[in-house]
Amino acid sequence: MSTIIDVYAREVLDSRGNPTVEVEVYTESGAFGRAIVPSGASTGEHEAVELRDGDKSRYLGKGVVNAVNNVNEIIAPEIAGFDVTDQAGIDRAMIELDGTPNKGKLGANAILGVSMAVAHAAADFVGLPLYRYLGGFNAKQLPTPMMNIINGGSHADNNVDFQEFMILPVGAPTFKESIRMGAEVFHALKAVLHDKGLNTAVGDEGGFAPNLGSNREALEVIIEAIEKAGYKAGENVFLGMDVASSEFYNKETGKYDLAGEGRTGLTSAEMVDFYEELCKDFPIISIEDGLDENDWDGHKLLTERIGDKVQLVGDDLFVTNTQKLAEGIEKGISNSILIKVNQIGTLTETFEAIEMAKRAGYTAVVSHRSGETEDATIADIAVATNAGQIKTGSMSRTDRIAKYNQLLRIEDELGEVAVYDGVKSFYNIKR
């Protein structure tokens, strides 16, 4: 047993130059843990509250001094004396201390920072890597990476409506080889875009952010890049999309406006038709947030039409919340959940969401946020839970590569027991 003797938070910066919360946990044994909280650009209405100061004279109102003070002045005294390995007890104590359904009093960014730092300190105390401490000796599956190589929507300053166009190197025999394949396609895409006279600057998540004629054109140039890199789309590499449709859903009309394509006033059924058409024309294996987070009828229709052959991921739809997920499971909506630790605010609740998804036959995709840091905790979480998939950006920007590098270290450490399932990680669809 090693008790917590001090918890300290500070304001640091994320990959967009915005403040976020870093937390350090100290124990009587000398074990130590540190974690930094990520932040999203496109956020679901039902996410746990990210506490910002709102003081326009500091960081344009995005400061997190209040969240930092909540850690140092309220949470720290409460959890001092806890056994650092009592993750569930510590998380529960913070949830009760906050006392709101959405962590709006103390802030999910304050609570999560402590939750993650506690896990790091506990792993340090028992002398195990974080993935092994959290997952035990069954933690051995490396996730299939979903690499966002073209950014659009709120993640880029371009005219592309859909937020992310991803490649999934499912044909690789190992995680290490999947990274090589992804990097080669990424560099091939840069050459393809350059030859077409298109911008090769990158967006928030490290993918390219060119102005394109349509969302379909984004898929076309990626196919060209896959072939240029020497791979075959639909065999070695599949495609995925995070549509983030809540970002272009018109609440006043109840319709979808694809401004980049000049198509407005689309109904839910017309959006579903569009996705079905794209899936016939391209080897798309995963679609995230195809309809607005509150358009459950639309999600139901999408699931009925293509849910047997395409992974349908709920991000804004489920917000890593077991109550939302349980409702989706009951109604037969989507077949996968995106797991973002800061949407719910504690590791304990994160693991509960993953477990609920697996019991229901849903896949779970561990995910970064668009505002990231050098913290690579989610890489360990993906392996600890044998999630099978991870979404953590493109093949550029250190804040994204940090997660891939950590997974490469884990695979190397696991050696022969490491498992990379590739296409088998999409176990609930027909491929």
UniProtKB/Swiss-Prot annotation:
Similarity comment: family membership: Belongs to the enolase family.
Binding site for Mg(2+): D242, E288, D315
Annotated catalytic residues: E205 (proton donor), K340 (proton acceptor)
GO molecular function per UniProt: magnesium ion binding; phosphopyruvate hydratase activity
Main localization category: cytoplasm
Pathway: Carbohydrate degradation; glycolysis; pyruvate from D-glyceraldehyde 3-phosphate: step 4/5
Presence of the UniProt keyword Chaperone in the record: no
E.C. number(s) listed in UniProt: 4.2.1.11
The organism's place on the tree of life at top rank: Bacteria
Keyword Secreted applies: yes
Cofactor: Mg(2+)
Protein name: Enolase
Organism: Bacillus cereus (strain ATCC 14579 / DSM 31 / CCUG 7414 / JCM 2152 / NBRC 15305 / NCIMB 9373 / NCTC 2599 / NRRL B-3711)
Residues reported to bind (2R)-2-phosphoglycerate: Q163, K340, R369, S370, K391
SUPFAM superfamilies named among the record's database cross-references: Enolase C-terminal domain-like, Enolase N-terminal domain-like
Cofactor: how bound: Binds a second Mg(2+) ion via substrate during catalysis.
Catalytic reactions on record: (2R)-2-phosphoglycerate = phosphoenolpyruvate + H2O
